[in-house]
C-alpha cells in the first residue's frame, strides 16, 4: 500500500467512525483506538504535505480565523414557516390545501421543531463546499469553516448522492453541553449564557474555528433541495439523506391523515422533556414533492408546510422568600424560594432572579403569585407577577446592601449588573469557593481532595487560603469527620503532587476574576512568570493579544492586593510552578523580536505548527490575519488568493520557507 493509499484508507475509516459515533450514536471502536488512528493520519499528513486535504478528519479541530463573515446569496431562498397554536388552525390549513389541490389523498411528514440556528449546507460531488446561515432568507453569512468542526456534519458523503444539492437543518446545543459550558463560566466568575439557542447561534459567528470545535454543537438535518433529486417525496428524501451520512432525526414520522398528525403532536407535547435538546413545536409538511411544487409559496412561507407551536412551559406559584448566594468571586446572586410546583417534568422549588435590575424590572415581591418558566427548558426563571393576587400589604423588595454571609457592605461597579462582596479574604463562601476552584481538575487537579473536604478543612481552622493546603499534615487531617489514614495520606500526597502542575494551570487556579483557561495561557505565554504579570500595568496588559480592559483591570487589582502577594510568596516558597519551565520556555534567540508573521499555505520543510513555534522561539509573533502591522507572510503552496492580494496591497514582504530559514541563520 502506498503512502497516499494509507492516508486515504485512514480518512475513510475515521469518517466512518465519526458517522457511527456522532450520527448513529453507535460507536464501533474505543475512543483510544480512534485517537491512535487519528494520530497516525496526522503524522502521515505532516510528513507528506502534498496530500493535504481540507476535508480530512484531521481538520475537524479548526484553527481558521475569520475576521469578517462574507455575505453569500442562497441558491434557494430560506423561507420562514407560518405558525399555528391550535388543532383548529391545522384543520384550517388542511382545508386551504385541499381547496387548492382538489380532492387528492394527502400524507404528511411530522418533524420536531428544533430551537437552534438554521443553516443551509451545499454539497458538490459528495463534498461540503459551503455553509450559510439563514440571514434574511435571501442571503446569509458564510460560516463554512465553523460548520466543518461539528462532527455530526459530514465533510464527505457516501453512496449514490446527487452531483449538487443543498441540505437544510438546525445547529443545536444539547442541554448537557449547555450546562457544562455555563458551569465553566460560573467557575471563573463570568455571566452564564442565557439559553442553548442563542449560544448555538453565537457559536457560528466566533472568529476562531478552533473555539467552535471545543463547543459541543450538534446538527440535525431535515430538508433537501436541488434539481433532479432522486426521490419523489419528502420522507423518501430523508431516508436517502441518512444513507448518504447525514444525521436525520429519527423522530420524523409519516402520517396518513390529520388525526395521525394530532397523535404525533400529543405524544411529543408530553414527552419533549425526554429529549436531549430544545424543541418548541412540530413542523407538518405535505409529503409529496409534486404537490409541494403545485402549492408553491406565499411572500414569506411555503403553503405546503406549517409549524405547530407547543404552549410555553409556564406555571404560577407563590414566592415565599428571596435568599442571596455568594460566589467565589464575591458575586451576589438573588434566588427565589418558591412554593414547590411541577414544571416540565420536574419539581421546581427555586428560580434565579439574576440581579437587582431584574427584580426591579418585574417588581417582584415576597408573597407574590409569580409566573415561572423554564428558560431553554432547563433553568427556571420568573417571567412575571399576577398583580391581581398581590396582597394589599405588599412591600417593594429592597435589595440587600450588605453581604448575607459576612455583613460587609456590598459594592456595584459602574457598567456591571451584579453586586459584589469586597471582603475577599474574610467571607466564608468566597474563601471556600476559591480553594475549591484552586483544586479543580482544570486548575491544580488535586486528587484526594473534594469540595466538601475543603469546607471541612476551613470550618476546622486548618485552611484560610490555598497556600495553607501545603502546610497540611496527616496528623491534622485524621481527626476530621469521615477521614481515615489512607484518605488523609492520599490528600496530603495529592497536594504535594500539584507542585508539578504547569504555570498556566497555576495562573488559572488563582481565581483572578475573568481569567479563564484561555486567558491564563495567553498571559503565561506572554509574560513567562508571575512576577512579570504582577509588575505589568494596565496599558501593558491590554496590549497582550485578546486581553481587554475588563480583564486587565481585574489582573491589576488582584496583584495590588497585599494579601494576594503574601499568598503568592508562600506558594513560591512551597515550590509551586510560578514560571514557565525551561523545557517549555524554548526561546532560542531574539532575531525576530518585534516582527509579526502570518503563515499561509502548505510547506515542504516545516509543518505550519513548526513554523509558528520557530517564529515564537526566536522572539517573533504569529498573526492570524494580514494587516498593516504584518512584517512578513510566509507563503507555501496553495496560499489563498485573497491573502496574497491583501499582502500585495499592503506591501507586506512575502517570503518562502527557505527565506525564513535564512532569516534565522543570518
UniProtKB/Swiss-Prot annotation:
E.C. numbers: 6.5.1.2
The record's PROSITE patterns line, in alphabetical order, gives: BRCT, DNA_LIGASE_N2
Q: Which GO terms describe its cellular component?
A: cytosol
- Residues given in the record as Zn(2+) binding sites: 403, 406, 421, 427
Source species, domain of life: Bacteria
**Every BRCT domain range:** 587-666
Protein keywords:
DNA damage, DNA repair, DNA replication, Ligase, Magnesium, Manganese, Metal-binding, NAD, Zinc
GO molecular-function annotation terms? DNA ligase (NAD+) activity; metal ion binding
Spell out the reaction equation it catalyses: NAD(+) + (deoxyribonucleotide)n-3'-hydroxyl + 5'-phospho-(deoxyribonucleotide)m = (deoxyribonucleotide)n+m + AMP + beta-nicotinamide D-nucleotide
User: Catalytic center at which residues?
Assistant: 113
**Residues holding NAD(+):** 31-35, 80-81, 111, 134, 170, 285, 309
Q: Which NCBIfam families match?
A: dnlj, PRK07956.1
Function text: DNA ligase that catalyzes the formation of phosphodiester linkages between 5'-phosphoryl and 3'-hydroxyl groups in double-stranded DNA using NAD as a coenzyme and as the energy source for the reaction. It is essential for DNA replication and repair of damaged DNA.
Q: What is the protein name for this chain?
A: DNA ligase
Which species expresses this protein natively?
Answer: Flavobacterium psychrophilum (strain ATCC 49511 / DSM 21280 / CIP 103535 / JIP02/86)
Q: What is the lineage of its organism?
A: Bacteria, Pseudomonadati, Bacteroidota, Flavobacteriia, Flavobacteriales
Amino acid at each position: 500500500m502506498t503512502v497516499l493509499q494509507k492516508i486515504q484508507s485512514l480518512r475513510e475509516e475515521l469518517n466512518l467512525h465519526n458517522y457511527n459515533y456522532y450520527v448513529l450514536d453507535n460507536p464501533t471502536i474505543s475512543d483510544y483506538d480512534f485517537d491512535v488512528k487519528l494520530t497516525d493520519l496526522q503524522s502521515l499528513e505532516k510528513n507528506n504535505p502534498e496530500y493535504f486535504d481540507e476535508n480530512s478528519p484531521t481538520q475537524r479541530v479548526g484553527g481558521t480565523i475569520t475576521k469578517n463573515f462574507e455575505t453569500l446569496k442562497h441558491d434557494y431562498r430560506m423561507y420562514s414557516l407560518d405558525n399555528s397554536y391550535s388543532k383548529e388552525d391545522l384543520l384550517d390549513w388542511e382545508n386551504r390545501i385541499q381547496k387548492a389541490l382538489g380532492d387528492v389523498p394527502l400524507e404528511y411528514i411530522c418533524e420536531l421543531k428544533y430551537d437552534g440556528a438554521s443553516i443551509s449546507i451545499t454539497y458538490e460531488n459528495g463534498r461540503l463546499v459551503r455553509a450559510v446561515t439563514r440571514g434574511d432568507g435571501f442571503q446569509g453569512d458564510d460560516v463554512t469553516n465553523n460548520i466543518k468542526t461539528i462532527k455530526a456534519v459530514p465533510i464527505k458523503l457516501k453512496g449514490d448522492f446527487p452531483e449538487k444539492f443543498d441540505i437544510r437543518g438546525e445547529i443545536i446545543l444539547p442541554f448537557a453541553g449547555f450546562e457544562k459550558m455555563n458551569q465553566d463560566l460560573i467557575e471563573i466568575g463570568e455571566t452564564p449564557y442565557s439559553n442553548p439557542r442563542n449560544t448555538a447561534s453565537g457559536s457560528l459567528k466566533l472568529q476562531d474555528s478552533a473555539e467552535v470545535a471545543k463547543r459541543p454543537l450538534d446538527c440535525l438535518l431535515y430538508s433537501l433541495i436541488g434539481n433532479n433529486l432522486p426521490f419523489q417525496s419528502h420522507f423518501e428524501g430523508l431516508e436517502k439523506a441518512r444513507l448518504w451520512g447525514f444525521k436525520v432525526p429519527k423522530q420524523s414520522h409519516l402520517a396518513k391523515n390529520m388525526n395521525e398528525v394530532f397523535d404525533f403532536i400529543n405524544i411529543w407535547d408530553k414527552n419533549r422533556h425526554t429529549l436531549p435538546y430544545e424543541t418548541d413545536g412540530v413542523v407538518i409538511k405535505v409529503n409529496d414533492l409534486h404537490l409541494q411544487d403545485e402549492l408553491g409559496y406565499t411572500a414569506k412561507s411555503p403553503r405546503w408546510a406549517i409549524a405547530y407551536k407547543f404552549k410555553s412551559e409556564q406555571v404560577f406559584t407563590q414566592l415565599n422568600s428571596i435568599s442571596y448566594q455568594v460566589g467565589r468571586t464575591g458575586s451576589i446572586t438573588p434566588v427565589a424560594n418558591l412554593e414547590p410546583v411541577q414544571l416540565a417534568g420536574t419539581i421546581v422549588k427555586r428560580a434565579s432572579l439574576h440581579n437587582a435590575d431584574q427584580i426591579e424590572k418585574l417588581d417582584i415581591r415576597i408573597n407574590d403569585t409569580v409566573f415561572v418558566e423554564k428558560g431553554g427548558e432547563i433553568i427556571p426563571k420568573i417571567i412575571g407577577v399576577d398583580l391581581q393576587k398581590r396582597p394589599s400589604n405588599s412591600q417593594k423588595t429592597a435589595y440587600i446592601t450588605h453581604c448575607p454571609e459576612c455583613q460587609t457592605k456590598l459594592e456595584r461597579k459602574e457598567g456591571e449588573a451584579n453586586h459584589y462582596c469586597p471582603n475577599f479574604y474574610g467571607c466564608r463562601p468566597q474563601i471556600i469557593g476559591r480553594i475549591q476552584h484552586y483544586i479543580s481538575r482544570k486548575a491544580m487537579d488535586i486528587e484526594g481532595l473534594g469540595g466538601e473536604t475543603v469546607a471541612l478543612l476551613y470550618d476546622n481552622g486548618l485552611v484560610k487560603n490555598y497556600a495553607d493546603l501545603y502546610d497540611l499534615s496527616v496528623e491534622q487531617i485524621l481527626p476530621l469527620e469521615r477521614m481515615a489514614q489512607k484518605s488523609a495520606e492520599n490528600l496530603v500526597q495529592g497536594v504535594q503532587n500539584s507542585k508539578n502542575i504547569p504555570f498556566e494551570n497555576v495562573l488559572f487556579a488563582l481565581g483572578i476574576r475573568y481569567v479563564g483557561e484561555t486567558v491564563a495561557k495567553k498571559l503565561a505565554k506572554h509574560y513567562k512568570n508571575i512576577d512579570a504579570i504582577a509588575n505589568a500595568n494596565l496599558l501593558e496588559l491590554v496590549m497582550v493579544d485578546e486581553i481587554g480592559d475588563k480583564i486587565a483591570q481585574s489582573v491589576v487589582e488582584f496583584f495590588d492586593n497585599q494579601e494576594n502577594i503574601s499568598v503568592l510568596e508562600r506558594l513560591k516558597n512551597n515550590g509551586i510552578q510560578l514560571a514557565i519551565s525551561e523545557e517549555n520556555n524554548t526561546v532560542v534567540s531574539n532575531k525576530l523580536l518585534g516582527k509579526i508573521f502570518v503563515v499561509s499555505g502548505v510547506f515542504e520543510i516545516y509543518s505550519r505548527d513548526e513554523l509558528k513555534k520557530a517564529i515564537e522561539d526566536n522572539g517573533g509573533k504569529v498573526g492570524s490575519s494580514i494587516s498593516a502591522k504584518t512584517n512578513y507572510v510566509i507563503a507555501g503552496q496553495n496560499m489563498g488568493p485573497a491573502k496574497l492580494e491583501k499582502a500585495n496591497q499592503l506591501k507586506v514582504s512575502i517570503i518562502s520557507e527557505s527565506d525564513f530559514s535564512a532569516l534565522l541563520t543570518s
